């Protein structure tokens, strides 16, 4: 089964917890704190494997969680960093954050890697908190939680040439006779439901990858006839081969077919109609095909080359393949967006996240609810089993301005404050 879009959950491994320990060893006076740091959690990494052709594996396993780092140990021994979770994906996979809709990675080359969910850093042991005022601290940090998110994987096939056209115009037959591909061929619409790739080689030794894309119909850019699933595979092609049925047996006018398909390509955006296009007048072995071709050429205003062929009798195929190879030699990788769009839409990720430290809301029952990534991360990294850690957390909250913000919201002694699933009293 060909799967080209799937939604999965990924989570980086949590960092290992730091340790509270002290050195008690003979002949070592004033040993002091000796708790080691926790190890870093594993990253979730996607790696391109050119042997894969579909996202089928993600259909059955949709949750990926890297392992956590090892906890710190006594004698200032740090926990081991966890191994990364490496997941293989086919070339042409685009990874998008399901929440923000931002593209995380566009994976096209064999061996290319991208970190999709980073593991959390390890918590610090008590030796990290030793100061002249507190030479024997009884506190440590829990490991930082790993990044977690839902992502959408979208496969856009990597082909040099894309065959487009209405259903049953002969695209699959054409691919089957010019390459070793064996697509399903039958006399009904939408026989082809998934892209088929074939390696084509011309008589002079030039080769390229051709994709037989499922048939398009009017309204495809709006999703009609599964149009979105089909059109996404045209995005990476450098040359478009537009196959038109000249027999007229379907009762449609070939020129109207041509206009309809090009309108769908232009409506899909990504400047698909600006790419080199070759018109293939197929089924020229049929009785009225020659007459229909002449009428088509009279109406045609675009400066695209027209090649009359018959995929069944193989008439005209040699000239067509030479023209496709020539077009590819003169056509570089086509940019999906122009410079202005890139300037407007590209997001630069930096180490400094401009995030709101915390938010305060109030439930109908009068409970003040705290939220925010920074505050929640601080809460999760605090070891509440130790008094010093609790006091440090309270100081950090005051430093972030949480206490003052609660007072401004009307919080008084004894009011209930909720953070995640935990509740505590506000003390002014």
Swiss-Prot record:
Subcellular location field: Cytoplasm
Expression induction: Part of an operon with spo0B.
Outcome of substituting residue 92 to D: Grows slowly, very reduced association with ribosomes, fewer 70S ribosomes in cells. No effect on sporulation or the general stress response
Domain OBG-type G: 159-329
Disulphide bonds in the chain: none
Subunit annotation: Monomer. Interacts with TasA (AC P54507) in pull-down experiments.
Family of the protein in this entry: Belongs to the TRAFAC class OBG-HflX-like GTPase superfamily. OBG GTPase family.
Function: Necessary for the transition from vegetative growth to stage 0 or stage II of sporulation, but sporulation subsequent to these stages is unaffected at 45 degrees Celsius. Required for expression of early sporulation genes, further suggesting a role in the induction of sporulation. Depletion effects on sporulation can be partially suppressed by missense mutations in spo0A. Strains depleted for obg stop growing after about 3 hours and do not induce the sigma-B factor following ethanol stress. An essential GTPase which binds GTP, GDP and possibly (p)ppGpp with moderate affinity, with high nucleotide exchange rates and a fairly low GTP hydrolysis rate. Plays a role in control of the cell cycle, stress response, ribosome biogenesis and in those bacteria that undergo differentiation, in morphogenesis control.
Entries under PANTHER family matching the protein: DEVELOPMENTALLY REGULATED GTP-BINDING PROTEIN-RELATED, MITOCHONDRIAL RIBOSOME-ASSOCIATED GTPASE 2
Name by which UniProt lists this protein: GTPase Obg
């Amino acid at each position: 089964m060909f799967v080209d879009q799937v939604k999965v959950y990924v989570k980086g491994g949590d960092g290992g917890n730091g340790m509270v320990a002290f050195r008690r060893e003979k002949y070592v006076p004033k040993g002091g704190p000796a708790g080691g740091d926790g190890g870093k959690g594993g990253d979730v990494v996607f790696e391109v494997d050119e042997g894969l052709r579909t996202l089928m594996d993600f259909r059955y396993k949709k949750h990926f969680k890297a392992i956590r780092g090892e906890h710190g140990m006594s004698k200032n021994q740090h926990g081991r960093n966890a191994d990364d979770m490496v997941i293989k994906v086919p070339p042409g996979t685009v990874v998008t954050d399901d929440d923000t809709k931002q593209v995380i990675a566009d994976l096209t080359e064999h061996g290319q890697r991208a970190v999709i969910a980073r593991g959390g850093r390890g918590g610090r042991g008590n030796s990290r908190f030793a100061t002249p005022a507190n030479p024997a601290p009884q506190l440590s940090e829990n490991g930082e939680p790993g990044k977690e998110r839902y992502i959408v994987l979208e496969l856009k096939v990597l082909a040099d040439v894309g065959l487009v056209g209405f259903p049953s115009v002969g695209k699959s037959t054409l691919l089957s006779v010019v390459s070793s591909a064996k697509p399903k061929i039958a006399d009904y619409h939408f026989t082809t439901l998934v892209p088929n790739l074939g390696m084509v080689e011309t008589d002079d030794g030039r080769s390229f990858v051709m994709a037989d894309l499922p048939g398009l119909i009017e309204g495809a850019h709006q999703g009609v006839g599964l149009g979105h699933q089909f059109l996404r595979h045209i995005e990476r092609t450098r040359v478009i081969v537009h196959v038109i049925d000249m027999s007229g047996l379907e009762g449609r006018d070939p020129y109207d077919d041509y206009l309809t398909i090009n309108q769908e390509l232009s409506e899909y955006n990504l400047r698909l109609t600006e790419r080199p296009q070759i018109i293939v007048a197929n089924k020229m072995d049929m009785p009225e095909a020659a007459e229909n071709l002449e009428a088509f050429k009279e109406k045609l205003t675009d400066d695209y080359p027209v090649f009359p062929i018959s995929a069944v009798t193989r008439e005209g195929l040699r000239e067509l393949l030479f023209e496709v190879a020539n077009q590819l030699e003169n056509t570089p990788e086509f940019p999906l967006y122009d410079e202005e769009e890139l300037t407007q839409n590209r997001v630069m990720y930096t180490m400094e996240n401009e995030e709101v430290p915390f938010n305060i809301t109030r439930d109908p029952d009068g409970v003040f609810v705290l939220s925010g990534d920074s505050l929640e991360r601080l809460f999760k990294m605090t070891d509440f089993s130790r008094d010093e850690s609790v006091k440090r957390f309270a100081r950090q909250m005051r430093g972030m301005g949480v206490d003052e913000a609660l007072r401004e919201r009307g919080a008084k002694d004894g009011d209930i404050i909720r953070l995640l699933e935990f509740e505590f009293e506000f003390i002014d």
